[in-house]
UniProtKB/Swiss-Prot annotation:
Gene that this sequence comes from: metE
SUPFAM superfamilies: UROD/MetE-like
The enzyme's E.C. designation: 2.1.1.14
UniProt-listed HAMAP family: Meth_synth
Cofactor note: Binds 1 zinc ion per subunit.
Organism taxonomic ancestry: Bacteria, Bacillati, Bacillota, Bacilli, Bacillales
UniProt name for this protein: 5-methyltetrahydropteroyltriglutamate--homocysteine methyltransferase
Species in which this protein is naturally found: Bacillus anthracis
Cited PANTHER family: 5-METHYLTETRAHYDROPTEROYLTRIGLUTAMATE--HOMOCYSTEINE METHYLTRANSFERASE
Catalytic reaction equation(s): 5-methyltetrahydropteroyltri-L-glutamate + L-homocysteine = tetrahydropteroyltri-L-glutamate + L-methionine
Family, per entry: Belongs to the vitamin-B12 independent methionine synthase family.
Cofactor: Zn(2+)
Pathway given in the UniProt record: Amino-acid biosynthesis; L-methionine biosynthesis via de novo pathway; L-methionine from L-homocysteine (MetE route): step 1/1
Length: 762
């Protein structure tokens, strides 16, 4: 039996975020197109070289992108919205789709399955001519071959997942459009095969959650493709969960290899193999290293997995690979020497995961004695971190044990609370607010850097933060907003900020991962029991409130978002970690309330993304996610108004969960998704406070008052004006001041116009 090492995808951003810096330099006209393309090529080839040097045999080609791999596929197949027809060059069209332009909104952006990566949603329009507009995978395959002598493994997004992720068609049209994808995929695969590609990875993560009818539909497409390209070696790759429910059918697909996730879908995939076996004429690609977390693998557990598989699988070959693309992990841990030895030793970033694949390959091909020293090291590392004091706090265990049913609910129902809050807050009809953050200018970032490097004192830094806060309180007053925010100038990241102030967290220096486009985040590491230490937001919020007679919101990140946007310890259930975070935030919320803050926002933008892919698993997740939010927020007085915020998700799946959060007001992204949530509310009622975002903050364009008014008008057709709020889609941290102020002025004017109309019609 031949055994090969493979990788599904490599982080794009570069060890020092060179990719991000190159993108942003190009967007700001600091480099020209030729310089941009040259630098991107250097980064792309460097990533291939690293994987080659680590000993990976099947190196992914085509996983590299200038923004997003789904957008790459949309452009390649001609899914280009007509509103961008004025643009002629590839990069102009491509980035207009991703970021919008002065006159046109960007394509929608949403979460990639249940990860914190965002993809650009492909748009189908009537009359669209689907064809292979650009065989980018072929160009990159030939580039790696010519420049480095690497016969790589082209990676493409499969036709079924691609179309399922797209929008703009009716369900009745789906089958017809799917058939139209056959010809361009045939051409794509034919050209790759003709160029010498030995194996082509076709990603179909959607296969983890399809109905039996959908799987049959997908199979027919693969049969049509195989008929035209009989000799191409295709690896059908699934990930993020098992394909247990449809495994029996999937293993009959006309492909040469099938990739399964034995980390996040281990139990289901093993059950399926035990029941149905695996085709002897296909290669099994075993996703055995976690591509979504940062912990060293349990090599003993992985080798036991292969022992089990080799007893049950009579395949000719095996491939050893990560569970999914390493896009979701930082690149290399070698710079993290500031961490404690027990934590550093327990980590494995992308490059270390590649090394683990090679270790496993050695054990499988040469026997476990060939890696006996490494096995002993791994066992010691796991024992040390498991038995550490940080993971065994008695106070945290006692607080969890003491929880009672009443800790998870507010004293009064929403309607009665809201009446009391209206009396206390004295807000107008259709109150206006923002989501929390204001522009993190070059000056803000530079001053923070100087403070962290010891160039300026704590006192100087605090004075600067107070100056920025006061400036933006005055801006908000002048604009005419009703509920103000302090601006979050002291925060680099909405999760990192809280993690730095809670026990149980640690932070990397260079643990960056891509969130969307050039936006990179550095997730905290939850390695121990989480506990409250001191007040985290009191000083800045109370200072902001002292500057104005208007209401200032306290701003916190919710427990489920902190959990989902962190790298989380894997020795206890995620539910338990979430409850620990919730208890710490509960303490902070009580401190804010006792300090006179009457509106407190607890953001949960990541609640939806944490949902399992399979609908049968949703209820269990939603139950503890909602309970975590309630645990954090339920100890305040009825007069204290709890807000929450969510963005970029398929909300129709979780309307009931949103309702169960029992937040007094929820703000939700609406404009970038082109009003889809408004459509959802046409079919259900939401009887609590709600603000549907009236403009997309991820685009530099300043929307007109009329655009925003139109969204307000549409929203009021499905929302009770008594409970309706007006706000942007999301925080304004990434925007420039000269974009923010006119946009908010337009928003306030739209609110005034809507109030006038409501009074006229009353």
């Amino acid at each position: 039996m031949a055994i090969q090492t493979s990788n599904l995808g490599y982080p794009r951003i570069g060890l020092q975020r060179e990719w991000k810096k190159t993108l942003e330099a190009f967007w700001s006209n600091k480099i020209n197109e030729e310089q941009f393309l040259t630098t991107m090529k250097e980064i792309r080839l460097q990533h291939v070289k690293v994987q080659q040097e680590k000993g990976i045999e099947l190196i992914p080609i085509g996983d590299f992108t200038y923004y997003d791999h789904v957008l790459d596929t949309a452009y390649m197949l001609g899914f280009i919205p007509s509103r961008f027809s004025e643009f002629t060059s590839y990069l102009d069209v491509y980035f207009a789709m991703a970021r919008g332009s002065k006159d046109h909104v960007a394509s929608e952006m949403t979460k990639w399955f249940n990860t914190n990566y965002h993809y650009i949603v492909p748009e189908y329009e009537e009359g669209l001519q689907i064809s292979l507009k650009d065989n980018r995978p072929l160009r990159l395959y030939e580039e790696a071959k010519q420049e480095l002598g690497v016969d790589g493994k082209p990676v493409i997004l499969g036709p079924y997942t691609f179309l399922k992720l797209a929008k703009g068609y009716t369900q009745e049209q789906f089958a017809t459009i799917l058939k139209q994808l056959v010809a361009p995929y045939v051409q794509l695969l034919s050209e790759l095969h003709a160029a010498g590609a030995q194996i082509i990875q076709v990603d179909e993560p959607i296969f983890a959650s399809l109905t039996k009818e959908e799987v049959q539909q997908a199979k027919e497409i693969y049969e049509a493709i195989r008929k035209e390209v009989p000799n191409a070696t295709l690896l059908l790759q699934t990930y993020f969960d098992s394909v247990e429910e449809n495994y029996e059918e999937i293993i009959t697909f006309p492909v040469s290899s099938i990739g399964l996730d034995f980390v996040h879908g281990k139990e289901g995939n093993l059950n399926a193999i035990s029941k149905y076996g695996f085709p002897a004429d296909k290669t099994l690609a075993v996703g055995c290293i976690d591509g979504r977390n940062i912990w060293r693998a349990d090599l003993d557990e992985v080798l036991t997995l292969f022992t089990t598989l080799q007893k049950q699988v009579q395949t000719k070959d095996l491939i050893v690979q990560p569970s999914c693309s390493l896009l979701h992990t930082p690149i290399d841990k070698t710079e993290e020497t500031h961490l404690s030895t027990e934590l550093f030793d327990a980590l494995a970033f992308a490059n270390q995961k590649l090394e683990e694949l090679v270790l496993i390959h050695s054990a499988l091909t040469q026997g476990t004695e060939s890696i006996s020293n490494e096995l002993e090291t791994y066992r010691n590392v796991h024992h040390t971190i498991r038995s550490s004091a940080a993971r065994n706090r008695e106070d945290v265990k006692a607080a969890r044990t003491a929880l009672k049913e009443e800790d998870f609910s507010r004293p009064l129902p929403f309607e009665k609370r809201y009446e009391l809050q209206q009396v206390a807050l004295k807000l107008p009809l259709l109150p206006t607010t923002t989501i929390g953050s204001f522009p993190q200018t070059t000056e803000v970032r530079q001053t923070r850097k100087e403070w962290r490097n010891g160039i300026i004192s704590n006192e100087q830094y605090e004075q600067f933060i107070e100056k920025e806060t006061e400036k933006w309180i005055r801006y908000q007053e002048e604009i005419g907003l009703d509920v103000l925010v302090h601006g979050e100038f002291e925060r680099t990241d909405m999760v990192e900020y809280f993690g730095e102030r809670l026990a149980g967290f640690s932070f990397t220096k260079n643990g960056w991962v891509q969130s969307y486009g050039s936006r990179c985040v550095k997730p905290p590491v939850i390695y121990g029991d989480v506990a409250f230490i001191n007040g985290m937001t009191i000083k800045e919020t109370v200072y902001a409130q002292s500057l104005t007679e208007k209401v200032v919101k306290g701003m916190l990140t919710g427990p489920v978002t902190i959990l989902n946007w962190s790298f989380v310890r894997n020795d206890i259930p995620r539910k338990e970690v979430s409850y620990q975070i919730a208890l710490a935030l509960r303490h902070e919320i009580e401190l804010l309330e006792s300090s006179g803050i009457r509106v407190i926002q607890v953001d949960e933008p990541a609640l939806r993304e944490g949902m399992p892919l399979k609908e049968k698993d949703w209820d269990a997740y939603i139950t503890w996610a909602v309970q975590s939010f309630l645990l954090a927020t339920s100890s305040v007085a009825n007069e204290t108004q709890i807000h929450t915020h969510m963005c970029y998700s398929n909300f129709e799946d979780i309307v009931d969960a949103i309702r169960a959060l029992d937040a007094d007001v929820i703000s939700i992204e609406t404009s970038r998704s082109h009003g889809e949530f408004i459509d959802t509310l046409k079919h259900t009622t939401y009887e609590k406070g709600i603000g549907l975002g009236v403009y997309d903050i991820h685009s530099p364009r300043v929307p007109s008052k009329d655009e925003m008014y139109k969204i307000v008008e549409q929203s009021l057709q499905v929302c009770d004006p008594k409970y309706f709020w007006i706000n942007p889609d999301c925080g304004l941290k990434t925007r420039r001041t000269e974009e923010v102020i006119p946009a908010l002025e337009h928003m306030v004017q739209a609110a005034k116009d809507a109030r006038s109309l409501l009074k006229t019609n009353a």
